[in-house]
């Protein structure tokens, strides 16, 4: 027996301690000092659904999509109440997990989390962001374990650092979207996929890790319905890679279909279709804008299939042309595709990359139909989950090429220089933006931070609109997700035409939940090209640009809303103009409202 025990490397301890210190600093800084509130409509929508679940109201929503209401009305063959309206748009896992945390912190109590007069950021926004950030940090840990098993701890450490300093990852982590939950679940799934590949290459039974991977893929599909395309890639791979052939694939397929079956039966009972309102997102990829169809009460007239094939090809090409932004902006990640040409010596590494490629290809096919963009925080951004493992293959391939250079062979000190260069280059977007963001955060720390304005200004909704509108009434708005989340009131997405508006307005009146008014914000006039407003808001164009006309002239005499003959009936119903934030956010009320305490601007 040897008297020597393995020596503890102080360098490793120092490096890991430094990593954890930086990780904690970035986490606390982003969640508290630099946080600007939620800025994604889908994130706010899921958050308010989670709050309803925490209150014991089930999977219900306070954001009413006219298309969803029409579906429910047709399915029930009668008028459907706006209160406790059941949602069929979102996948259930993220709202359920968020609801558990909100229940724990008392997030269902509106009074407990009411904003103070000095606050600019809604307190529950930070809770939502913290949940998403927690999943992001867990994903870093899982990927470190996976990559160190596939390659080595050095490559795993580089990938962990790249993830930590990735601006795109932090953007999604703070958005409240389910992408970080998806990243963690996908990372867990492919960890067990690799374990199964290892077992198969060694002649052992791969059933257990392959099925465990299937469990995580099932959870993944419940976090975002589009991830079924990722699971499809795994099912195809498993059908050929693991013996006995087809057994694992069939088991995984059954695991996915069982919970999916319950969801589809639930959706059918509410909307009359097993895919609920979610299937209408297909219009985003094939027929113009998802927003257009969600805001209409006449679904048959809004599917424009002109140029269908060209739209699919365009989105497919977009995914390849903008592959770097899709892969979180990590410039080395696309080297994964070149590494497919390299003959890795270890069979599991060589086989694993084909599994990743197959899952990525099926995902790209799905997104070609449903649409995706690298700009902003796209809720359909699924390529993001592939970024860490593709980065690992890219770093490994670069390391192989680097190690074969003559000057590197002759100068051992240069052995890890390529890692340093990659980390610096990929971290620059985050590092360069930090000084300005930190400075702004420090200046506004007493007010909780700087809001995501335009178009969102939580105080106007949480402090003013909530006080104006009784809980029993509904609000029409161009940002119903924000009204539902911040004002905690039922909000209907403003239809584009007067006929659709009047149908929903009359339904609300018949249900003793008469609309209190119409809220216009920068979500309509400020986030669109001026030429696009008439096509998106049609009969309500004059109302949408009404506030801007008055701001430009400095007088209410230039109002366009009450001079529009198309809206005469609407003007009579909602004649009182209430500035919630000057005329940047205007509430057209059915009753006169005192507004002396509303600010003129953010």
Describe each region flagged by the PLM:
Residues 173, 178-182, 187, 220, ...:
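Hydrophobic/aromatic-rich transmembrane helices and adjacent perimembrane loops
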Residues 109-125, 138-165, 183-184, 204:
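Transmembrane-helix signature of polytopic, membrane-embedded enzymes
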Residues 3-7, 197-199, 229-260, 264-265:
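Perimembrane helix-loop-helix junctions
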Residues 158-159, 163, 212-217, 251, ...:
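Transmembrane alpha-helix segments characteristic
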Residues 12-23, 207-215, 231-236, 253-257, ...:
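Signature aromatic-anchored transmembrane alpha helix within multi-pass, membrane-resident enzymes
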